[in-house]
Curated annotation (Swiss-Prot):
The gene is SOT8. Induction: Up-regulated by trans-zeatin. Residues 1-31 are annotated as: Disordered. The lineage of its organism: Eukaryota, Viridiplantae, Streptophyta, Embryophyta, Tracheophyta. Pfam families: Sulfotransfer_1 (PF00685). This is Cytosolic sulfotransferase 8. GO terms for biological process: response to cytokinin.
């Protein structure tokens, strides 16, 4: 799709243009493949992945209007793959020269406030959001769950950095299930229903393997600008991975920082234990009412074993192996 084909949300446009543009948007949406997910939401397939109507419009807004800066950093992931943790780590690393440990923004703000979503926040609320009021500047920090193909539409040849984190599919499933039910306040969504949805690929931002593969291939083709991280490696070798992340972001730790415990200080600040214990994350919420505490659960590797049957394990393992065949990637 070329730039001239991308429709715009015209709330801020001239009255006479609004009607035509909204028809263009409707026309695009009606031309896309659609399906219903396990929650009853109608999804549309765009650039390889599924989105609801509002998120799709936000992605189109982003594709049309986003102006990248050379120093931009974008944290990307499939939902419930370690996004909150990676946002905290990336913010702490990239902004560490501006904040001391005593007055650090992570002590009084949730990571999702400090690293806003492009399609779930900024471009969902406005077709042309004011990006001069971001919590971070030079570098600006953003996040996304959209596919790599959708993300790179406005980036073109921009040298901005993209950091992607993937996680074991079975742990993603259980974490997503717990999160969805905590959002509703009821246990209306069964694990079995979400499991079948994930296996079919018809779920928000899915298919999971397409989301992961896009960024995996991007990291192989352009390792200078796309970094592919694994949640499990962040858990087992955090010091190695955070130093790798700092190098990628062009803000490596100095010898003085390492000698003075700078690496461990950031790891402690951003640990799920520390973040979940902060008052802001116990009692605060996003503007749309999502409680901050819903973003923190166990964060353990292998927690899926307490929930999934051997049959579910075998089925999803076979699907993932088939979908990733020949890519060189294992989840």
């Amino acid at each position: 799709m070329g730039e001239k084909d991308i429709p715009r949300n015209l709330k801020e446009e001239e009255e006479e243009e609004e009607e035509n543009q909204s028809e263009e948007t409707k026309s695009l949406i009606s031309s896309l493949p659609s399906d219903i997910d396990c929650s009853g939401t109608k999804l549309y397939k765009y650039q390889g992945c599924w989105y609801d109507k509002d998120i799709l419009q936000a992605i189109l807004n982003f594709n049309k209007n986003f102006q990248p800066q050379e120093t931009d950093i974008i944290v990307a992931s499939f939902p419930k793959s370690g996004t909150t943790w990676l946002k905290a780590l990336t913010f702490a690393l990239a902004q560490r020269s501006k904040h001391t440990s005593d007055n650090h923004p992570l002590l009084t703000h949730n990571p999702h406030e400090l690293v806003p979503y492009l399609e779930l926040d900024l471009y969902l609320k406005s077709s042309k959001p004011d990006l001069t009021k971001l919590p971070s500047s030079s570098p600006r920090l953003f996040s996304t769950h959209m596919s790599f193909d959708a993300l790179k539409v406005p980036l073109k040849e921009s040298p901005c950095k993209i950091v992607y984190v993937c996680r074991n599919v079975k742990d993603v499933l259980v974490s997503l299930w717990c999160f969805e039910n905590s959002m509703s306040g009821e246990n209306n969504l069964s694990l079995e229903a979400l499991f079948e949805s994930l296996c079919s690929g018809v779920n928000l931002c899915g298919p999971l393997w397409e989301n992961v593969l896009g960024y995996w291939r991007g990291s192989l083709e352009d390792p200078k600008h796309v970094l592919f991280l694994r949640y499990e490696e962040l858990k087992t070798e955090p010091r190695v991975q955070i130093k790798r992340l700092a190098e990628f972001l062009d803000c490596p730790f100095t010898k003085e920082e390492e000698d003075s415990g700078g690496v461990d200080k950031i790891l402690e600040l951003c640990s799920l234990r520390n973040l979940s214990g902060l008052e802001i994350n116990k009692t605060g919420s996003l503007s749309e009412g999502v409680s901050f505490k819903s973003f923190f659960r166990k964060g353990e590797v292998g927690d899926w074993k307490s929930y999934m049957t051997p049959e579910m394990e075998n089925k999803i393992d076979m699907i993932v192996e088939e979908k990733l065949q020949g890519s060189g990637l294992k989840l």
